[in-house]
Amino acid sequence: MTSAKPAPLNRLRQLWREGRPTFGAIATIPSIQTVQIMARSGIDWIIVDLEHGPIDLGSAHAMITATAGTPCVPMVRIAANEPWLAKAPMDLGALGINFPMICNREDAEKAVRSVRYPPKGDRLWGPFHAPFRWGV
């Protein structure tokens, strides 16, 4: 008896490793239904935009959850390269953060540290939403 290998949690990493292009959309309207339709359309990723529109964390959580059961990877764009802005979306189940204004190496290192756990980063464990969303 053989067991099927589970699909990767974040399939974007696999697609990028293979050098394949990915396609997605940026959601600026707080609509669960729109995200469900887009996630089922065959796109690879959706970025929930917390920087340029009226989407709050509650709406972002619902929009992230709306990708469940699809291969679409939910990500969130935050308003600034500040670690505290990246924490909640990651804890809510986002599989990536789109950071604005990365202008140099220090900016990039700060962004990476904010989404990685120690010893490689500064992110703390938020056990409330993401584990239930992703079954971990």
Predicted feature locations:
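Glycine-rich, proline-tolerant flexible connector loops at the mouths of alpha/beta enzymes
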Residues: 34-62
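Conserved anion-binding
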Residues: 84, 96-136
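Glycine-enriched alpha-helix->loop->beta-strand junction motifs that scaffold or abut catalytic
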Residues: 41-45, 91-96, 116
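Short, acidic/polar
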Residues: 27-41, 80-88
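N-terminal amphipathic alpha-helix/helix-capping segment at the start of soluble metabolic enzymes
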Residues: 1-26, 136
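Short, small-residue-enriched loops and turns at beta-alpha junctions
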Residues: 52-56, 82, 104
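Alpha-helix-loop-beta-strand connector modules within alpha/beta enzyme cores
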Residues: 57-91, 115-121
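Hydrophobic faces of well-ordered beta-strands that scaffold small-molecule active sites
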Residues: 21-27, 46-48, 74-78, 97-99
